[in-house]
Amino acid sequence: MEPREHISAGDRVFSIEDRPLGTVTGIIGDFFRMAGTDGIEGMLNASDIYTVEHHRVTMIFSSTSLREHQISRR
């Protein structure tokens, strides 16, 4: 199964440095919407997922690069 098939709303999202990034609020195809801990809402691609375990999604992004990624997509 693909990692995105294990994601559901309410899952917590973390960076590869184990910093909390936000919470999944919805899934649209190969993307999921996330409410960030910094107040920024964003869409992330499922291909950027590192692992999904026990309602915990770990992204390949560091917390700094994710913020830059979200801002560049606005």
Mark where each language-model region is.
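Peripheral interaction segments used for macromolecular assembly
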Residues: M1-R74
